[in-house]
């Protein structure tokens, strides 16, 4: 889990647009965040396994 201060800091509008970065909406993780879902890879995987994301299925071939 990310520190509350870092989550609050990321919610503020940066002085320069380049400084903005994405965080997971669920846990606050800053790395490996999928923009389409707004989730990190860990949360995305957990929610997909539980069937909480419509249209997402585990691939098998």
UniProtKB/Swiss-Prot annotation:
It comes from the Bacteria. One of its GO terms (molecular function) is rRNA binding. Zn(2+) binds at residues 24, 27, 40, 43. Pfam families: Ribosomal_S14. Binds 1 zinc ion per subunit. Keywords: Metal-binding, Ribonucleoprotein, Ribosomal protein, RNA-binding, rRNA-binding, Zinc. The keyword rRNA-binding applies. GO terms for biological process: translation. InterPro entries: Ribosomal_uS14, Ribosomal_uS14_bact, Ribosomal_uS14_CS, Ribosomal_uS14_sf. Its cofactor is Zn(2+). PROSITE patterns: RIBOSOMAL_S14. GO terms for cellular component: cytoplasm; small ribosomal subunit. Belongs to the universal ribosomal protein uS14 family. Zinc-binding uS14 subfamily. HAMAP family: Ribosomal_uS14_2_B. Part of the 30S ribosomal subunit. Contacts proteins S3 and S10. This is Small ribosomal subunit protein uS14.
């Amino acid at each position: 889990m990310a520190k509350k201060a870092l989550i609050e800091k990321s919610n503020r509008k940066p002085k320069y647009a380049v400084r903005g970065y994405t965080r997971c909406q669920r846990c606050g993780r800053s790395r490996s965040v999928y923009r389409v879902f707004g989730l990190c890879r860990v949360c995305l995987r957990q929610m997909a396994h539980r069937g909480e994301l419509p249209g997402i299925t585990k691939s098998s071939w």
